[in-house]
């Protein structure tokens, strides 16, 4: 039995900001069966995740970025995190009807071979399935690992989160508040700033686009300095943060979205503060911490069910909307976690 299979194809390697014209939206056919003698599963993709790291994979293969993930192959569907339902299985640990989240191609149907720390069976369905693209998936685990494992927070510390209304930042802020920290976030619009203060419980927030002097803005928000910085932006923001860090401050480098579309990345000028203030800066990738995923679920699920942790999604309906949604991410058009709905069942 065959079915039509819509796909989002990368035309060629991307330079600068991606545009919708960098992608083709095509329709092909797929055999609705698993190849004999394999451990593969056939899945119907339900939700797809738009994430900043995907821009890195759109560029030409590079030894540095290869340490994070392989570049996409032009002419093939792009890949990312998604939520899928199994419709046929050749894998002993998965059966028809099971739900999983993990890496899939941007298409309606995919044949995948589930791998440890790349695909996870969904056991808890009393929460929105789309949460497994965000709050309960890679971004949520990123926030948890980066804050607790990398930053080693203590009650009463000051925490700054950039890109704070995004998929990762909105959870980092809530985790920090639960720790008894003083939390400030930045975002790129009044709507997002209001969200940080009214929805996510940040103590303060500011629109970085309205600040002519980021160093002064941070000094205003943190008159006694910053203990922890959760880095999602890079560039000028990192420069301003370094001046405002406290002694023995910690910086968890999760992302640098301000740099991904630049031909020549911006330099950072205030690095001497790392020495003077004994600042610890650590880059991290969420896959290094997936062995703690079950611990993460045990921690976060009760808080979600009790309404102590909330999450905002920006939902695009239909696979044909996926290129627009992904491109919009790099212009700050999304409010909250950007999700693409391929199918709800």
Curated annotation (Swiss-Prot):
Its main location: cytoplasm. Gene3D superfamilies: Medium-chain alcohol dehydrogenases, catalytic domain, NAD(P)-binding Rossmann-like Domain. Pfam families: ADH_N_2, ADH_zinc_N. Induction: Up-regulated upon treatment with paraquat, t-butylhydroperoxide, diamide, and menadione. One of its GO terms (biological process) is response to oxidative stress. It comes from the Eukaryota. GO terms for cellular component: cytosol; nucleoplasm; nucleus; plastid. Keywords: Cytoplasm, NADP, Nucleus, Oxidoreductase. Optimum pH is 8.0 for 9,10-phenanthrenequinone-reduction. Optimum pH is 6.5-7.0 for azodicarboxylic acid bis[dimethylamide]-reduction. Optimum pH is 6.0 with (2E)-hexenal or 4-hydroxy-(2E)-nonenal as substrate. It catalyses: an n-alkanal + NAD(+) = an alk-2-enal + NADH + H(+); an n-alkanal + NADP(+) = an alk-2-enal + NADPH + H(+). GO terms for molecular function: 2-alkenal reductase (NADPH) activity; 2-alkenal reductase [NAD(P)+] activity. Belongs to the NADP-dependent oxidoreductase L4BD family. Involved in the detoxification of reactive carbonyls. Acts on lipid peroxide-derived reactive aldehydes. Specific to a double bond activated by an adjacent carbonyl group. Can use both quinones and diamide as substrates, but not menadione, ferricyanide or phylloquinone. Can use 4-hydroxy-(2E)-nonenal (HNE), 4-hydroxy-(2E)-hexenal (HHE), (2E)-nonenal, (2E)-hexenal, (2E)-pentenal, propenal (acrolein), 3-buten-2-one and 3-penten-2-one, but not (R)-(-)-carvone, n-nonanal, n-hexanal, (3Z)-hexanal, cyclohex-2-en-1-one or 12-oxo phytodienoic acid (OPDA) as electron acceptors. This is NADPH-dependent oxidoreductase 2-alkenal reductase. It comes from Arabidopsis thaliana.
């Amino acid at each position: 039995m065959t079915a039509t299979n819509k796909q989002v194809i990368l035309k060629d390697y991307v330079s600068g900001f991606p545009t919708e014209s960098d992608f083709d939206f095509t329709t092909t056919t797929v055999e609705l069966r698993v190849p004999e003698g394999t451990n593969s599963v056939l899945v119907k993709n339900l939700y797809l995740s738009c994430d900043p790291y995907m821009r890195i994979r759109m560029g030409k293969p590079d030894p540095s970025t290869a340490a994070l993930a392989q570049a996409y192959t032009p002419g093939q569907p792009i890949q990312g995190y998604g939520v899928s339902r199994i419709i046929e299985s050749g894998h002993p640990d998965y059966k028809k009807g099971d739900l999983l989240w993990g890496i899939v191609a941007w298409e309606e149907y995919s044949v995948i071979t589930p791998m440890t720390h790349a695909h996870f069976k969904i056991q808890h369905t009393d929460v929105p399935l789309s949460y497994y693209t965000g709050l309960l998936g890679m971004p949520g685990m990123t926030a948890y690992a980066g804050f607790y494992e990398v930053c080693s927070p203590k009650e009463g510390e000051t925490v700054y989160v950039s890109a704070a209304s995004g998929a990762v930042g909105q959870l980092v802020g809530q985790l920090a508040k639960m720790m008894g920290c003083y939390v400030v976030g930045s975002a790129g619009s009044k709507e997002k700033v209001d969200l940080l203060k009214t929805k996510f419980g940040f103590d303060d927030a500011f629109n970085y686009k309205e600040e002519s002097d980021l160093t002064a803005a941070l000094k205003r928000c943190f008159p006694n300095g910053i203990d922890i910085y959760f880095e999602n932006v890079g560039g000028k923001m990192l420069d301003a943060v370094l001046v405002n860090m406290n002694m023995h401050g910690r910086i968890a480098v999760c992302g640098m979205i301000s740099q991904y579309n630049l031909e020549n990345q911006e330099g950072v000028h205030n690095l001497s503060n790392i020495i003077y203030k004994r600042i610890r800066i650590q880059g991290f990738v969420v896959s290094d911490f997936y062995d703690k995923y079950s611990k993460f679920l045990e921690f976060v699920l009760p808080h979600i069910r009790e309404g102590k942790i909330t999450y905002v999604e920006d939902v695009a309906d239909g696979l044909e909307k996926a290129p627009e949604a992904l491109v919009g991410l790099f212009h700050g058009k999304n409010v909250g976690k950007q999700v693409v709905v391929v199918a709800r069942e």
